[in-house]
Structures are given as structure tokens and as C-alpha cells.
Amino acid sequence: KVVEQTGGDLTKPNLAANLGEELGITINDTAGKNRTGGDYTRTAINNLKWADPKTLPNNPEDPNELGSEVHNFSRLWTGAFYDVFTGIVNENRAAGMDAAQALREASNEGLRMLGRLVKGAPRFDFTYKDMAKAFIASDRDGNEGKHVDLITQSYKNRGILPADFSLSEVGPSPVPRSLTDEQAAVQKD
């Protein structure tokens, strides 16, 4: 369905990008108006940039404006991750995959990336910048850095990482490097 809607160009509105919006509409339609706390438009296709939540309105009416309310503010991270996901799809297309295969492979890669990030995520009190650094570390240490440049640039573009951010600021990931098939076979013996 996403390929049908976009022809492989994930910057166009599509089911996957608008999943949060559709869920909010469904909940509000079923459970009553404003049940979710607002008419959240949580499309992943956005151009939101980092701002200190203390300086933001709670939940602005303009969907292109970032708000401090947690669901509203989360659109910043969602958009940044979607930028990475779109970049992977584009890389796959450039490598010769058709739109459906590129999307399928990027979806699988995205799930693996999120899994590594969750395992290596900072605990307790952390910032979006801390999470972005953990995302970079998890890819560098668990995926041979395949998407480090893409992740770094996406999070810089969103202001989550500063423009002068250096990879030397990223510490080791607590997630162990993935085993190769040969290493896994040796460990089984």
C-alpha cells in the first residue's frame, strides 16, 4: 500500500507516515472527541526542529509548530527517525532495488536499528541528544557503522545534535557487537 501511495518516494504522504494520526482519529471517533488530549497530527513527514520544551507552547494549533506536550514533542524524534528510514529506502533504490523491495529491506533494517537502540538506550534521565548519540553508537558498534553518517546528518538537520557535533563525542555502546554466522556456530559447539 505504501509503495502504491508513494511510488517509492517516502516524502509523499502515506499510510506508514500517518499511522499516529490515523490512530488518534480512530480513538477520538470511537471513544469521544478529544479523548487523546487533542487532535494530534503526528505524521512522520515533518520539518520540526529542536527547541527547549520549556520555551514552547503546550500544544499549538498549527501542526507545523512543535509543542511541549509529550505527544506533540515526540513528533520531532519520529520525524528524525523517519528521515533515516527514508534515507535507507533511497540508498536501497540507488542500489537497484525496486520500490517494494527497498521498502521491505528498509523496514527490516529499521526494526533492527530500533532494537539495537533500545538495548543501548540511556537509562533514567536523558535528553534527545543523549538518545541520538546512543543511536549512533548502536549502529557503529552493532552494525559496522553502516548508517552512522545518515543518522548523524538527520539528527543534525533536526537540531537534536548541534551543527558542530563530532563523532568523537559518541562513547561505546553497551550493546555487544553482533556475532557473525561463523562466530555464532563456534559458540554453539
Give names to the regions the model predicted.
Residues 1-189:
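Zinc-dependent metallohydrolase catalytic domains
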